[in-house]
Amino acid sequence: MTTENGTVSTKIDAGIATVTFMHPKSNSLPGPLLAELARVIRELGSNPEVRVVSLGSEGKGAFCAGASFAELQSIADEATGKKFFMGFATLILAMIRCPKFIVTRVHGKTVGGGVGIVAASDYVLATSAASVRLSELAV
């Protein structure tokens, strides 16, 4: 998938499915990108060729900046708010329910909803540049 909402790419080799996401705004995750990641995880979970899912993001900066700030600012009513917050819930549930091991590769800052992705992983490999922050705790 490639759109103005970012990209999700998948490659399967020797039983390992490598899933990589990218968004130009520090790998933030707008709704369509979250939905695509959840769909891909569910699909790989039922693929008999796949034994392990390796999840990561592109770039050398942030692993994941969390939710799309523009989408958060655009919430005008309860229905829109519910849809916004269900995006991460849907992805995290897909990861938790996936019968394959999910190994997440973290290479930089991980903020907000990105922390949920890390927590939903079976294993996490982090570089020395990785850091985790829940911005909600700064309030």
Please report, for each region that a protein language model flagged, where it lies by residue.
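Short, histidine-centered active-site or binding-site loop motifs used for metal coordination
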Residues: 21-25, 73-76, 106
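Glycine- (often His-adjacent) and acidic-residue-rich active-site loop
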Residues: 57-91, 110
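Conserved CoA-thioester-binding segment of acyl-CoA-metabolizing enzymes
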Residues: 1-56, 93
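CoA-thioester-processing core
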Residues: 91, 95, 105, 111-139
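Hydrophobic/aromatic residues within transmembrane alpha-helices
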Residues: 19, 55, 68, 117-119
